[in-house]
Amino acid sequence: VDPAQVSGSWRTAAIASD
Protein backbone atom coordinates (compact mmCIF):
# COMPACT_ATOMS: atom_id res chain seq x y z
CA VAL A 1 0.00 0.00 0.00
CA ASP A 2 1.37 3.41 -0.93
CA PRO A 3 1.78 5.67 2.11
CA ALA A 4 0.80 8.65 -0.02
CA GLN A 5 -2.43 6.93 -1.05
CA VAL A 6 -3.24 6.04 2.55
CA SER A 7 -2.53 9.60 3.69
CA GLY A 8 -4.76 11.00 0.95
CA SER A 9 -7.51 8.54 1.84
CA TRP A 10 -7.39 9.58 5.49
CA ARG A 11 -7.37 13.24 4.48
CA THR A 12 -10.44 12.78 2.28
CA ALA A 13 -12.23 10.94 5.09
CA ALA A 14 -11.35 13.68 7.56
CA ILE A 15 -12.57 16.42 5.23
CA ALA A 16 -15.81 14.57 4.50
CA SER A 17 -16.30 13.89 8.20
CA ASP A 18 -15.58 17.50 9.12
Curated annotation (Swiss-Prot):
Keyword Transport in record: yes
PROSITE patterns referenced in this protein's UniProt entry, alphabetically = LIPOCALIN
Transport as a keyword of this entry, yes or no, is yes
Q: Which domain of life is it from?
A: Eukaryota
Which biological process terms from the Gene Ontology are attached to this UniProt entry?
sensory perception of smell
Key words of the record: Olfaction, Sensory transduction, Transport
- Complex and partners: Monomer.
Q: Could you tell me what this protein does? A: Binds the chemical odorant, 2-isobutyl-3-methoxypyrazine.
Task: Please give the family membership noted in the entry.
Answer: Belongs to the calycin superfamily. Lipocalin family.
**Name the record gives this protein:** Odorant-binding protein 2
Supply the source organism for this entry: Oryctolagus cuniculus
- Taxonomic path: Eukaryota, Metazoa, Chordata, Craniata, Vertebrata
